[in-house]
Amino acid sequence: MNNIKDKQLKYEKALEYEIFTKWEYSFAKSKIQNANCIFDIWWHIWLFSQWCRFLNDKTRIHYFEPVGDSYNKAKSTLWNDKNIILNNYWIASKSGKWIILLNQEKTMQSSKYSSFLNPIWKEIECRFITLQDYLIGNDIDKIDFLKMDIEWMEFEVLSSRWDFERKKINSLISEIHLMNEKMESEWNQIFLKIKNTFWNVEIINSKYREEIFLIWANRVSWL
């Protein structure tokens, strides 16, 4: 168990270095600084939310973490920030309870699906909600900045009810995982929808694997 915790800490330190020292996401700085509503859907544990708060001390941040232990760690870190809304569930194509394959060493690489990112996993039951249900339930009219890294479940979210959700998002970052040919085909359709929604769309390639990359999309004005 201590070995797992040591590896978790090592990975968290590496993520912290990427965000706060290397500023790998500085391309989004101005959008975050001007955002009133930010969605942080499981990317770099709670570190990205902290970076957003560092850049913008007034914005309201909605943070999503489905795994109980990780949620409790985020809660103990962010509890005193009343403008960070902590949600112990994930965004998906359907609301309900589902099994996540938890990568205990690198919890950020857990998913509903198994791949090289989580070759050794533990099954845990987690809650999920659709983005549309969350927006309606919390009376949110728009999202200024949405960041999503949900280990190739992004295909479900970006495909489901997109006609409703795309009109709510001003800026979008999502990590895309092309794990097989089927996903490549689906991605072509999703990418077309994104290009038809946002004025400026960029692909930011990963320095680690060519099948994983970021989509960075922005609109000029609301529809």
Summary of predicted features, one role per range:
Residues 1-223:
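Phosphate/nucleotide-binding beta-alpha loop and adjacent structural elements of enzyme active sites
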